[in-house]
């Protein structure tokens, strides 16, 4: 069957379950937007600035547990979206950036807004795929999604010349690659179980990769709940991922992100084992590389992340497991519950008590105006249970983390993302 490259590209996006794309419409990819308009399953969200479009695509990816898609036109369009792409790279968030390039006949001639995207994006994307042949378009899209959503997730750019969109092609739609899920070695699982069993004051940090290789978020969150309750463990969601554990659950051990209050952090520092489950570990989470100390932690540390290259890059853990965090949780749940797990009950209760005290709607008056805590608490009165909050990356975000409780209402086997009470913080 003959179709235009633009139509093939639109079909390829549909094949990857994309239901919306974000953009500031530009002539460099106008063929694609024309093809998308003809499709009922994909909405075009028109934005006022590429920075907003790229952040929206990033948020869409986080909420739907797949790569979001942003369309940008040539050099300036991409430059406007760089902050969001940089954020997605640092946050290990999957994102596909489709860039409309100058026509092929004008390559290398300093055509209007021409840019070398491989050089520009080298430090903030996982890959830059340049397409110059009609037969490669759908394959390039499939590869982009696979790279963006695999291992350490992140942004991938696909560069397509303007004149290519209108050309005809016989190439088929390339379907998504199977989603892979890495499993831990049995000896690593045994060692982790032993480390947790021996620990009297463990702290479990959970991050975005907890969901990265999962087909069902509800199963992951349910299993995490079960592990926390059965093994008597405190769970601390990390920066930008507060929705991973109910902040009103008795095993909630406090949020680990921007400006953790000393009343909580000082008690956390008494831990004798930190299990980092699906968190890449950054300066924000580690409180400026001091908790744990880099490169040598001051307590036992286990790091679970689906990419072996990331483990040991900054911290040298006692145990590193390059595997799906959910598969690690499932492996632990298949083991017998430690007989003396109850010894950690007081440790969990004290952490939770300190966390709950921070949730109380109390703040000091500001001599020079309104304490931002008062603003956040007032906003919280009107939030729906499934509200999504967007925040900038400044320290003021700590007020949101502290005063707005995060929870999920259901944990059914086939729960959709709308059933989750989800809070999203987009930098």
Regions found by a protein language model. Give the residues of each.
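Single conserved hydrophobic/aromatic residue that forms the stacking wall/gate
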Residues: 410-427
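Structural signature of the thiamine diphosphate
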Residues: 19-20, 58, 62-72, 76-99, ...
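Active-site diphosphate/adenylate-binding microenvironment
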Residues: 6-9, 14-16, 24-27, 32-37, ...
